Every structure is written in C-alpha cells, then in structure tokens.
C-alpha cells in the first residue's frame, strides 16, 4: 500500500512539473493541456476549483446552488426517491434506482448506502428527517434549495440522472465541482466547465463584496491543475 502511494506521488509530481507555475490559461487551452497530460490508465474526472472572495464564516455569504451540465458528469448517478402512490410510479418511470417510503428509511437506518443522490416529496420529509445524522454529513440530505424536495419528483430524478449537480462553498471559501470526464470531446468538457462557472457566478451572495472569483483552476481528480485567466471567464 505504501509503495502504491509512492508511485502515485511520483506520477503526480512528474505531471506537475509540466505545469508552468504562475501561467494562466484560457479555458480552451486549459482543456487541451489537461488532455495532453492525462493518465491513460483510467478516465480521470476534471473539476473546477474556485477560491471565492467571500467571508466563509458568514452564512449570508455562502455560495450554493445547482446546475445541469449539458453533457452530464460522465458518472452513473444512483438516485433514490422517497414518495408514495402516483409520485412513486412517476419516479420509477423517470429512472429512480430505488423508490420507497418508511421502508426505505428503515433500510438506510440499517446501513444501506448504495446511492449518490436523494429526492423526496415534501409530504415524506417528516420520515426523511429521521435520517439527518446519516445523510447530512455526507451531503445527501434533500432540501428545497437544491431542488431535491419537490412535488415534481419525476423531474428532479430526470435532472439528476442527466447530470445536474449541487455545489456549495466550504469553510475556507473554496468551492469544488466536477465538470466531466477527460474522455469527453474537448468542446463538451469546455461547455460543461463554462456552464458551471456561470452558475457559480450567478449564485454570488448579495452580501459578498469586492473581487468574487479570486482564483479558478481546472484540475484533474488524481493530478495537477492549471489556473484559468479569470478575466476571460
């Protein structure tokens, strides 16, 4: 295990030396560059990493929102849905992997966690709230703000399956979100990244002042990143 860590570190450092320190890239050039240094052993995920000009200790300066990436994330998203009756049938038709009510709550309380996103009808939230300590720390608790607590569960399921993601700034003022796989055509990866960047800019808190996008980096999940020219975004 230690040897594997060393090998990964050497590969990372080798790729990192190729990145010119202090250089900024346009988004198209950044996508092209990362494709040139990609690890051919597996399909890496590209992420956009932001350092925002916010005061992260102020709740009214938190940047949070959702965005539907036009070309998806490249990852199969397992979606579960808490609903009953007609809503349950609609969620199943929309592609939900598991649909349930009290039985699904009990299943998760028993340790089952084979899912990536959660949708709930508002009338199920009394039951779903019992899972707060389980889902909350993992960022899986559904909420109206993220569009995952809604009467239109079918639409929410479809959007999540199609590549809608949630983003949220952290306690350091950073924000990190995936924008696709390096195997995507460069145009698709660029469009996804632009869509994500635009969504983060549009979600700028009203209380935030000054330079908002302090740094934006296009990175590899297991490798280095390159700084984007913020003025071009």
What are the functions of these language-model segments?
Residues 1-21, 207, 227-233:
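Intrinsically disordered, compositionally biased charged tails
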Residues 25-89:
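Translation machinery proteins
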Residues 30, 91, 136, 218:
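Residue-level signature of catalytic and energy-coupling elements of molecular machines
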Residues 42-46, 203-215:
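Flexible, glycine/charged-enriched surface loops at secondary-structure junctions
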Residues 52, 83, 122, 179-181, ...:
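Flexible glycine-/small-residue-rich
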Residues 73-75, 85, 170-173, 209-212, ...:
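Short flexible coil/turn linkers enriched for glycine and charged/polar residues
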Residues 90-97:
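Glycine-rich phosphate-binding loops that contact phosphosugars or nucleotide phosphates
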Residues 97-201:
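Long, charge-patterned amphipathic alpha-helical coiled-coil/hairpin "stalk" segments used as oligomerization
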């Amino acid at each position: 295990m230690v040897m594997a860590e060393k090998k990964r570190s050497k590969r990372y450092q080798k790729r990192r030396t190729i990145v010119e320190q202090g250089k900024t890239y346009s988004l198209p050039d950044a996508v092209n560059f990362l494709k040139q240094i990609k690890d051919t052993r597996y399909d890496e995920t590209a992420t956009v990493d932001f350092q925002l000009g916010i005061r992260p200790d102020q709740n009214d300066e938190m940047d949070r929102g959702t965005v539907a990436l036009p070309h998806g994330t490249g990852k199969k998203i397992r979606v579960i849905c808490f609903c009953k009756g007609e809503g349950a049938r609609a969620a199943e038709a929309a592609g939900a992997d598991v649909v349930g009510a009290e039985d699904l709550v009990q299943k998760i309380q028993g340790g089952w966690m084979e899912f990536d996103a959660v949708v709930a009808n508002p009338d199920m939230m009394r039951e779903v709230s019992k899972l707060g300590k389980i889902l909350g720390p993992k960022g899986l608790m559904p909420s109206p703000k993220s569009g995952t607590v809604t009467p239109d569960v079918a639409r929410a399921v479809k959007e999540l399956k199609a590549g809608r993601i949630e983003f949220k700034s952290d306690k350091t003022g950073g924000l990190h979100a995936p924008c696709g796989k390096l195997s995507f055509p460069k145009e698709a990866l660029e469009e996804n990244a632009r869509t994500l960047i635009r969504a983060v800019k549009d979600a700028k808190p009203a209380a935030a002042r000054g330079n908002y996008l302090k740094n934006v980096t296009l990175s590899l999940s297991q490798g280095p990143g390159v700084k984007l020219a913020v003025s071009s975004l």
